Amino acid sequence: MLISLSSSTLLTLFFIALSASWLSGLLFLHARMPLRFVHIHIGIAALPSLVSLLALVNNNGDRVVGPWHLDTLAWLMAFFVLTIGLIIQRFSVRYLMGDRSYRKYFALFTFTTGVSSVAWLSDDLRFMIMCWGATLIGLVLLIGLNKGWKVVSEATKISGYLFTISWIALLSAIIWLFQITGQWQLTSVVTNENVAQFGTLEKTGINLLIIVAVMIPAAQWPFQRWLIESAVAPTPVSAIMHAGLVNAGGIMLTRFSPLFHDDIAQIILLIFSSISVLIGTGISLVQVDYKRQLVGSTIAQMGFMLIQCALGAYLAAVIHLILHGLFKATLFLQAGSSVQRVEVVKQSNKKMSNLWMIVGRVLGLFIAIAFWFITSGEGYQLVSALILGWSLYFSWKQLVVFGEGRMGRIAGLIVLIGFSLIYFTVHNSLYKWLHTDMYQSVQPSAPAVIFVICILLFSSVICTFVTRNQSSTLSAVLYLWSVRVGEARRKSVESHPSYLKHDVSKGGNS
């Protein structure tokens, strides 16, 4: 049985562990420190993650301790970001070996994930803006560590430029909030009494600034360029970027959620996020580069997460960003497994495949209808039901319909059932854990729900048409447009890394 500790004690232990990990990272930067010290550093870096887990398990409810807001969401996000960072650092021990910036990567990984976790523990908006700014700076430094490569320099410039705009937008929103409420504490700013003081234009203006601050790190249209060009960063950097940092918008919007209720800013966020979902999906479908496929996937997934926020489903958005982070980190760290020998897929009995396809459609429709009746019947649940039914049908098609022979279909069915059970178990556990009054879903307006459903149906119709008419003019136009949107600028692309010539001429990396 775990020893029950007070919130202030856990907070003190957390900052001691975090300071120790930062000190370890600084020590590793010293040239005289042997490279094998990295293993000790990984052990020390695990301490704040363990303390945040202990705090999460011992959480005694919503507590405000000085400038810190210690609720379940805060400790969960601290644990999530630090654990993702720890796993990626462990992966990088051998992956980045030989890189001239080897030591700097670990120091920056530790610093960036550390200040990011502190940002979500902050109740004081001044601490939050400082920590979030430090997180963005750390991310830019990670992207630009390979200074000898011109392409990386270009990616660093555009990332730094857009992140500066994002940070200034959030800073402006926070200062505006202080001028109206006279409060720096977030929990005091978003009370019903203070929110009622806001005029319509003031509320919309603040919300639009927060939306801009959120959309840029989430790589939403028209700010997706930085994420596309950052694909030149090493795989561990991309992993921490996609899994633990770009999804911060969901947490930020959740913290400021009372401000967005019944405001036109929700519709604006919904429109831009829906466009981003379409663009990201198109990029992931047409790109042949594995990392750019994942970039497109992240743009689409972050768009859907922001759609959830726009519909008032903040709890669903938080669960989405956690599951997406775990999934995307796994995909990046397992990127090498995508290089497989080409196999000729044998066509099975066409009639049998069509029969299994029909079964999948009926099953997906049945699950969607059942989910709709079982849930509370809120507007967002209808969207969830449609997505759940489509996801089940798509998974059935890939794992069962395209399975080779009877054993292949049986294996696919077992995998589908197993992962479905795991997903629902994790989803329900997180839902019960995070289900507090502050993060209750707000009933979305009927036009917003109808708009999202129309976007989903439109996307489905377009995909079906393109699949069945690949030689049509519309298919060619959509393909070329998706390729163009998903490509980096010409000066941000090289057919071969030019900096390698310098390394080869010196006999390798030193």
Swiss-Prot record:
InterPro entries: ND/Mrp_TM, NU5C-like, Proton_antipo_N, Transporter_DabB. Keywords: Cell membrane, Membrane, Transmembrane, Transmembrane helix, Transport. The keyword Ribosomal protein does not apply. It is a multi-pass membrane protein. The chain crosses the membrane at residues 9-29, 37-57, 68-88, 105-122, 125-145, 158-178, 204-224, 226-246, 266-286, 303-323, 355-375, 382-402, 410-430, 446-466. It is found in: Cell membrane. GO terms for molecular function: NADH dehydrogenase (ubiquinone) activity. The keyword Transport applies. One of its GO terms (cellular component) is plasma membrane. GO terms for biological process: ATP synthesis coupled electron transport; electron transport coupled proton transport. Part of an energy-coupled inorganic carbon pump. Expression of both dabA and dabB (DA2) restores growth in ambient air to E.coli deleted of its carbonic anhydrase genes (called CAfree, deletion of 'can' and 'cynT'). Forms a complex with DabA. This is Probable inorganic carbon transporter subunit DabB. It comes from Bacillus anthracis. The lineage of its organism: Bacteria, Bacillati, Bacillota, Bacilli, Bacillales.
